[in-house]
């Protein structure tokens, strides 16, 4: 599943702005790294420079400023032998992201491949703010918050994080007892809740641009 990230709404109306000013807010977004710590395909035993944590770290270091928001939209711990490290104290992919210093991390659909206990363990290792506001435990507890507010250069940024509802199709057994709600509906509730408290709202969504399987809310265009 592809990940989509985009600005949703400016939170303040022009009429409510007393002093106009501008700044450059840069958003660096990564996703679908799929266990690639280095630019190397371990299964094929050959170089693969299509994207890796090492390359991301370099790009982020070269471009980061005081007004840069760095986010990742998941599919991090699956493929390229990454599953071999799920029982480590800190998964090497997570350790690398911690070293880079991400602001926000959102789960991808492949994070659910190994069961919820494993996922919760891995998420506890993240230093970034973990967001996934549409997955709930059997007790009704959210897997993670649905949003966070981050200040960059005096700008209050509301960041919403959701995962595709189709994880119940692909990992139904792993999600037994858990509830996955519609990410579009959840996002709209959050927008109404925080729109007067932030300057801008962005969404970090691990889902396609258009709907998959005709499922409403599985594409960001519904938002």
Feature locations, PLM:
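Acidic, metal/ion-coordinating pockets
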Residues: 14-223
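N-terminal export signals
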Residues: 1-13
């Amino acid at each position: 599943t592809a990940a989509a990230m985009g600005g949703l709404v400016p939170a303040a109306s022009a009429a409510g702005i007393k002093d106009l000013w501008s700044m450059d807010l840069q958003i660096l977004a990564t996703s679908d790294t799929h266990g690639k710590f280095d630019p190397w395909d371990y299964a094929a035993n050959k170089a693969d420079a299509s994207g890796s944590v090492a390359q991301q770290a370099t790009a982020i270091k070269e471009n980061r400023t005081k007004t840069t928001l760095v986010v990742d939209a998941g599919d991090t711990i699956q493929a390229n032998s990454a599953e071999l490290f799920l029982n480590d104290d800190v998964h090497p992919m997570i350790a690398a992201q911690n070293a880079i210093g991400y602001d926000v991390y959102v789960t991808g659909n492949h994070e659910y491949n190994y069961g919820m206990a494993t996922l919760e363990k891995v998420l506890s290792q993240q230093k970034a703010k973990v967001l996934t506001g549409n997955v709930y435990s059997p007790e009704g507890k959210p897997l993670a918050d649905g949003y966070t507010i981050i200040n960059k250069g005096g700008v209050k940024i509301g960041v919403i994080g959701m995962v595709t509802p189709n994880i119940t199709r692909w990992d139904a057994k792993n999600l037994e007892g858990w509830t996955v709600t519609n990410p579009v509906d959840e996002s709209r509730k959050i927008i109404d809740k925080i729109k007067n408290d932030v300057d801008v709202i962005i969404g970090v969504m691990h889902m396609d641009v258009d709907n998959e399987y005709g499922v409403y809310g599985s594409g960001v265009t519904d938002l």
